[in-house]
Amino acid sequence: MKTSMQRKLDQLSTRLAELNDLLSRENVTADLDQYRRLTREHAELGPVVEQYALWRQSRNDETAAQELLADASMRDFAEDEIRSARERMVRLEAELQKMLLPKDPNDDRNIFLEIRAGAGGDESALFAGDLLRMYLRFAERQRWQVEMMSESASDLGGYKEVIVRIAGQGAYSRLKFESGGHRVQRVPATETQGRIHTSACTVAVMPEADEIGEVEINPADLRIDTFRASGAGGQHINKTDSAVRVTHIPTGIVVECQDDRSQHKNKDRALKVLAARIKDKQYHEQHAKEAATRKSLIGSGDRSERIRTYNFPQGRMTDHRINLTLYRLEALMDGDLDELIGALVTEHQAELLASLGDTD
C-alpha cells in the first residue's frame, strides 16, 4: 500500500475515534444539525476504518508468518499463511481504493430528468416516450418517487419535451451517466415500406438544488410570462393563463410549466427546474477543464454528444463510451438497467483510480 494512502487511512481512523467520543457526550443532540452532520460522517467513515483494520490484521498475520520461516517444521505452514495474507491484503487494498475515491457531492441528490425529441420528427417524439417509460420503470424498481414537472406531447402520443422529478436514495449517482444523445434505429409504426429509420433524442440529468436559495438567482434577471395551457395539437385545455414561462436573462435558459391548473404551482415548479438547470450549467463549466484533459463518462454536458444506440431490428443496445453491447433490448427498455449502469459505474471508478494514480 502506498504511504500516502496509508497516511490518509490513519487520519480517518483517528477522526472516527474523535467522532465516537463526540457522539457519546450527553449534550450531543443539543444542536440537531451538528448531530446529523456527525452521524452522517460517522456512517461514512465506519466501513472504511473497519476495512483498514482488516488490512492491518492481514499485514500482522504476514509478519508473524515470516518469523516462522526459520523453523523448518513450520515452513510449509508459514508459506501458506504468507500467501493467504498477501492475497487478502491485495483484495482489501483494492476495496479501500474504491472507498477512498472522491465522492460526487451530488450523488445523494434527487434529480430532474429531461428528455427532448431531436432529429426524426414524430418517430423521435415516440422514442422520447419510450425512453421516459424506460426510466420510469427503472425508478419503480428502485422504489423512487416520480413527479411530472412539464410535458409537451406530440400528436402521435410521444413527447417533444418532457421533464420529470425523480426522488430517492442515490437517484443522481445511478442516472448521472444518462446525459447525452440517444440514437434509435427501427422501423417506425408510420413506415409502410418496412425501412429502418434513424432518429435521436437528448437526455439531461440534473441534480436538484436542496433549496432554490442554494443557486443564486436575482429576481431582476428573470422574465416571467403567463399564457394559456394547451395540449397536443394546440387545443386549449384551460381558459385561464395558468401556464408559466420563466426566462433567465443572463444565461438564456427558458423553462415552461403548464401541467397544473394553478399558476402558482406551475411557477414554483418552473423555478425549481430553472435552479437545477443553472446548477447543472455551473457544474459543467466548472468541470470543463477536467473533461478536456481526460475522458469523462459524465461528459461535457453537450446534448449532441452521442452516448448510446438502440437498434431494435437486432435487439441490441450499444453504449459507445465503454464499448458495451447488450443483446437484451426488450428488458432494457422495460427498465432493467442494473447491468448497464453497473458497467458505467465500474468504468467511472476506474477513471477516478487512474487519475488518482497520475497525481500520487
From Swiss-Prot:
Q: GO terms for molecular function, please?
A: translation release factor activity, codon specific
Q: Pfam families under this entry?
A: PCRF, RF-1
Gene Ontology CC terms, in alphabetical order: cytoplasm
Report which gene this protein is encoded by: prfA
Q: What NCBIfam families would the database entry show?
A: prfA, PRK00591.1
Keywords from the UniProt entry: Cytoplasm, Methylation, Protein biosynthesis
Q: What name does this protein carry?
A: Peptide chain release factor 1
Q: How is it modified after translation?
A: Methylated by PrmC. Methylation increases the termination efficiency of RF1.
Q: What is its main location?
A: cytoplasm
**Which sequence positions carry the modification called N5-methylglutamine?**
235
Q: Which family does it belong to?
A: Belongs to the prokaryotic/mitochondrial release factor family.
* Role according to the record: Peptide chain release factor 1 directs the termination of translation in response to the peptide chain termination codons UAG and UAA.
| Domain of life according to the entry | Bacteria
| Keyword Lyase part of the UniProt annotation | no
> Where would you find this protein in the cell?
Cytoplasm
